[in-house]
Structures are given as structure tokens and as C-alpha cells.
Amino acid sequence: MTNLKQVLTADISCQLLYVNETQASQVESLQALIAKHKLPIILNAELVTEKLNQKRRQQLSQIVTQPILLLDEKDKLSWLSEGLSVAPEWDKLQRRVVSAGRKSELLLQAAKLTADSEVIDATAGFGHDSLILASTGAQVTMLEQQPLMALLLLVEQLRMSTLPNWQKLMSRLQIINTDALTYFARFNNYLGNGNEQAIDVIYLDPMFPEDSYQDSKTGKGAKVGKHMQALHQLAHPPTLDEEQQLLQSAQAVVSQNGQKQGRVIVKRPQFAPSLADQQPSESWNNEAVRFDGYFV
């Protein structure tokens, strides 16, 4: 099985399996999207005539030495991870996005966004939390360090932009393939040159050990879904030093927000320690997750 944590530190040679000859134009569109956004992905496309049932997908996950993307018979692009096809699947969040508000979404209670807010989701992942943030009318910049994930996000944004009910929300999302620290440094330099754009909220959902959802005393806790399992293949949890650098850099960005109070919101499993061992200004939690707010 491919060690993605090593592969994704350089240009990625990625196998794309598609199941119908008529999808050749979509393969070309994917190549163009990769070039447009300068993603370090080398896409090796292959037409597959055999049926990719669950057993065959599991076999491919075990024997193939590079990441696999699958363009299925419904023209949906997914990543084959441990035999499971995973994709952002934003359309499945429609009911949640439509009804999102501070009463139903703990994240929005913590972020306290308005329609004119500027937000950075510095660890976008599959983009589900970005949708909730953007449902308020806020502009959300989504940072995703892993090129493979960034490609899935860009494809999903294009797909959802064809649906009338989603077009306004999609227009409020900007997806960038970069790591948070590099972007924060560039942004602070941008502000330092006299530019006035300011960020109201930075949202962080860093990787954490797979057992972090469990209470260390009882062993009980929330189950980890397939999307989270897939993300654990892409990234290591940050070290304490890396956590400190990430939190400090985020705080530096939101501190340049004029007279308004900026805030950094950090998502943690309910039983996980605070990011960088720094006590938050305030926390919001339920039985599974906790949102720690750092006010600047």
C-alpha cells in the first residue's frame, strides 16, 4: 500500500481510473484544472473495463504503489482509500447547510460570523466545515496542503457550481493548495505593505491521533468516519512545536483586524488537550467535539 505521507511531500504520481470511453473529455478537464492551479500532480489515466466492485477496490488499495483516483460511472471523482471511495460529497450536506445557524451549529456559536466576515479555513480537508462557515454569507478562503485533497475540493466546487441552489455559496469559497504557515507569512507581509484586507476568523482543525476521540479513562468516545480515516493517511498529527507555531501565526493574522476583535477557532476531539497546550479564551462542546476560541 502506498505511503501517502511520504509521497505527498513531492510531486505526486497519481493513477486515475475511469470506466467509460466517453469520459476522456473529463480526464482532459482534470488535467487542465491541475495545470491551472499548478498542483504538483502527475495524472496517469487508464480506462478500466472490469467492474470495480468492493472486493476489487480493496485489492487495488493493497497492491498499487501510488494514490488512486476513480472516475465512476456517475462521473463522480473520488479517492480510493483502503478500498473505500471517499470524496467531499457536499450535496449530502444540503439539509445541514440550509438549516445551519448558531442554535444548531456549535462552530457558528464559536465563530460568531456575519455576512461581511472574512474567514480562513486553514485546514480544509474535505471542506465540510467550510460550507457551514460560508452558509452565514461569509467569504471563506480554504487552505489545503495536500494536492490530492485540493484537487478533490476544486472538482467538487465546479460540480456544485452547476446546481442553481449552490451557486451563491460556491462563489464565496476560494480554494488554495498551500500550507497554513506559508500562507499566514505571505498574508502578514501583504498587510505590512499597507493593504487593508483583514481576517475576522481563522479556523483550525489540525490532525490528531486516531484515539483522541476516546476518553482515556473509559475508552468510550465517538467513532471515526471514513473521511477522517482517509485524512489520517495523508498527514501526521503536528508536534507540540508545530502546534505552537500554527496557533501563534494564526493569532498574528487576526490581530491585524483594526478595532474589531479577531478570533482563532480550533476544533478538537472532546477529550483531546488544548492545541499547543494553550488555554482558550472560551470553549463550546458537545459529546463528541470541542471548539476552543482564542480571542485577539
From Swiss-Prot:
What catalytic activity does the UniProt entry give for this protein?
guanosine(1516) in 16S rRNA + S-adenosyl-L-methionine = N(2)-methylguanosine(1516) in 16S rRNA + S-adenosyl-L-homocysteine + H(+)
Main location as per UniProt: cytoplasm
Q: State where S-adenosyl-L-methionine binds.
A: 205
Q: Which SUPFAM superfamilies match?
A: S-adenosyl-L-methionine-dependent methyltransferases
The EC category is: transferase
* Enzyme Commission number(s) of this protein: 2.1.1.242
Q: Which GO terms describe its molecular function?
A: rRNA (guanine-N2-)-methyltransferase activity
Tell me a GO cellular component.
cytoplasm
The protein's location, in the record's own words, is:
Cytoplasm
Q: Which UniProt keywords apply?
A: Cytoplasm, Methyltransferase, rRNA processing, S-adenosyl-L-methionine, Transferase
Q: What does this protein do?
A: Specifically methylates the guanosine in position 1516 of 16S rRNA.
Q: Tell me its family.
A: Belongs to the methyltransferase superfamily. RsmJ family.
**Protein name as it appears in the record:** Ribosomal RNA small subunit methyltransferase J
Originating organism: Psychrobacter cryohalolentis (strain ATCC BAA-1226 / DSM 17306 / VKM B-2378 / K5)
**Gene (UniProt):** rsmJ
